[in-house]
UniProtKB/Swiss-Prot annotation:
It comes from Takifugu rubripes (Japanese pufferfish). This is Macrophage colony-stimulating factor 1 receptor 2. Its EC number is 2.7.10.1. The lineage of its organism: Eukaryota, Metazoa, Chordata, Craniata, Vertebrata. The active site is at D827 (proton acceptor). It is found in: Cell membrane. The juxtamembrane domain functions as autoinhibitory region. Phosphorylation of tyrosine residues in this region leads to a conformation change and activation of the kinase. The activation loop plays an important role in the regulation of kinase activity. Phosphorylation of tyrosine residues in this region leads to a conformation change and activation of the kinase.
Amino acid sequence: MKSYCLLLSITLSCCCSAEDLPDPPSIHLNSKYLPNQAEAILTAGTPFTLRCTGASSVHWSSSAFCLLYHGRLVDPIDVQRADPRHTGTYCCGYTNQSLEHLSTWIHLYVKDPADPSTVFVTPRNSPRVKEGQDFLYRCLLTDPSVTNLTFQPEDNIQGSGQHLPVGMNVTVDPQRGALIQDVQRSFSGQYVCSGWKDGRHFISRSFHLLVAPRLPPPSVAIHQNKAVRLEGEKFEVTCVSSSTTHLFNVTWTHLTKKNFDVAVTREYRNSHMYISSTLMIAAVSQEDRGTYTCAAASEDGVTTATTHLIVLDSRFMTTYLKTWHANTKAKNKEISKEIDGNLTANSTSIDIEANRSSKLHMKMELIANVSTDGVHVNNISSSTTVEAYEGLDVILTFVTESYPPLSNQSWTKPTKVNNNNNVTMYQENYSINDTRSEASLLLRRVRQEDHGSYTFHFSNSFFSGSQNIDLRIYRSPSAIISVEKNTLTCSSSGYPVPTIAWYSCPGILKTCGNLTTTESSEADPTSEHDEENVRKLLNLPLSTGGDVTAECIASNQVGAFRKVFHLREHNSAFMSALIGAGSTAAILFLLLLVVFYKWRQKPKYEIRWKIIESTEGNHYTFVDPTLLPYNYKWEFPRDKLRLGAVLGSGAFGKVVEATAYGLGTDDVTRVAVKMLKPRALSEEREALMSELKILSHLGYHDNIVNLLGACTQGGPMLMITEYCSYGDLLNFLRARAQDFMASILSADEMEGDPFYKNMATLYGRLRSDSGISCCSDYQEMQPILGSAEKQQGVQMGGLSFGDLLSFSHQVAQGLDFLSTRNCIHRDVAARNVLLTDHRVAKICDFGLARDIQNDDSYIVQGNARLPVKWMAPESIFQCVYTVQSDVWSYGVLLWEIFSLGKSPYPNVAVDTHFYKMIKDGRHMTQPDFAPVEMYQLMTHCWSLEPTDRPTFKMICQLIDRLLQSNDDTNHQSYSNINETKKDDFKGGKSQRRGEEEEQRRQRGNLWIPLSVTNIYQLS
């Protein structure tokens, strides 16, 4: 009320030019004049009279609780006995509405010294406020001498120290009360107003603030966001709105139109009120086009939805062709012709440059643009040529904007293109949305037999036609030479059409290409060709004067093909044959010697995984894997498997990425396929079959690379396993070592810390100390991304301390599973752990696909190559392999993980000193990033006595507790790592380890002593 009167007074003061306006009313208290905005103090129990005089009739309004509900007050206000609840603002104004801005107000304080509880007067009811609104709690002060006014929780008065809720902004005014801005649900509670006078603390009666939750505004939806109509057609659109309250309405607006024909229906169901508002236009015109907005409004807010109306004066059709194919550059040749119905059809011939990148590029071209005002148009047709490389995907998409919308769309393909054996070689997709339609044809990994004419047919009630696409597949040339009398004919085929050149040179040579040759010009050569075949003739001389080599070279942008013809003199034929036979025999003999030598030098492959048949102490009897049964349910059709890029290769075999169609429940599955190289012997074939049998015997587990299928008949043996896109763990850690170290050091520490200055050196050491010889032809496992993933910008992310613990835990789970299946791995190392795209660690054995002959991780012992630095002492010195020896190797793998991919025993050669160090029980030092618990686990894994080593089940339980602790103390763990790095470089490693041990004891006893007898129950 006071604010309203103040606003009127300010308005009055600004209107100085209005000389004909009367003066504001004047107020008298007990016959004493009080100026505008004056304050007066009364004592409770005394009478008072307020009188207002002015140029015309006046009326009163007041914020006093005693007079608040009296309705319109009349002059004068006569009170026989003043009460503290008469405290408030009294405003007098003219009853004439044109003079409402002229008003006068005063504020009365009615204090009662005998009753301290009346220092504040408050409403009798607890307020209920809606969330998000401002709220004025009128705790009115009756004694202006009370100062230090505050608004606070009631519990704070009792000494609990409770403060206002977070985000509560309160302004206390002695004349108005406490204004709370933007009330939130967290503000609910008991509050009081308080103040101080002469050392005494006065508080108001407490009140309970109830905050009603803010209701969402009504929902609104228009299912048709765009509509197209011809002039004179009917248009209807329905807007559906719903809310939990009945108090909302729905309205339509348009930029130019004001009046609408609207039908409204209401329905209450499921505790919601639904309002459907349908806007109707009987015959649209150009004035009706534009955006129509449907607004649903309530006291909780306004929600809108729009639809756009397009008004056409004639029917139309516009068609585009989008082609997705390999990285190409199109060279367009436009051909235009007139067709009935004011149609211009454009066809484009596309020439593709020789770039075999698998990244897809899109090109869009206009095919047809037609309009008609009522005549049916037929024969909307044109032709387009698309060229593609064999083995790549091609996507043909026709995009049509038309009115009326298309009612029929279809593709016809060459008869030889079909989906055989339930393998989808092509896929059609159709969509129609309002006036826009799309028809796509996906051809997967096109082959030569896929070339030909592809036709798209379309129609609606006014337009019909077809678009033809001539698909050409690039093909490298082939050539043959035929002889007829004295004429050589070189016939070549390929696409693009090859270019043929004849060359001749004296003597019998393999090729004329390395000599100074000239194109034959004896007799004019003739040529003839069609789109894919070409012939060129060469006339031979009647007398050659010796042996002559004629060479035909056919080439196009895909490749070149050479064909040689030897013309011999008769007297030299026998000598040439004799020389040729002798040379061939000598070459064959040398080749046999080389092959025999290589065969003697080639290491015999042995599969690392072993299945235990029985045990007697430390003596294990292993199952011969060749005797394991093979279940032919694993067989998978070869024609449903498309091989891709090589993931890894070795001396005996390789692993390639592949796509399997119809494997399991998925239509398309990305897999890895292990296969033998062509020069592999029967021993390698038997080894791969043994590995297949072992995997099928083990069964499924999340943390091993699981078998998905196999092809053992009708061709080379293929073993199909899960695909792990991140490659092996070793390279994964090394690739992210620098980012991991940077993430655990703050920017300030990096500027002055000597560790940061040496990061590049350390990173270089991580990269160079790989254990792979520089002369090795072994291709390490690498992640390969498909084209779709590249387009989406797949980010493989960084590396965290939690990731290191997770990898350790998952590998332990996988090895625990192997131990329960009586399986010994014998080559546990980071290089034999793969990561999926979700960073799931899976144990594998590269086996045939790892070149151990050129891998420095494998050391020659006798006639075998062994991973000595990962092997347990009993395996090195006694050739004993047990589950406990896998535990030793797992400890070395942990060292690899927490050193971010360093090679174990860095800078230590495998010699007599190394073997003595192993026998003496000397361990590697704690890795840079390993907590105390993990290093203790490593040392327990390296116990000289195998039975003192922990079981994999115990290891899983320990790391599981560390993972849970890491979630709770993630920030603290990184702080410890930062301190660790500084201490290592500053010589304080022992002190740091003592501090970490103390922190470990404070966090709780996560470590359980693992030096207990390890007895695996093998059954």
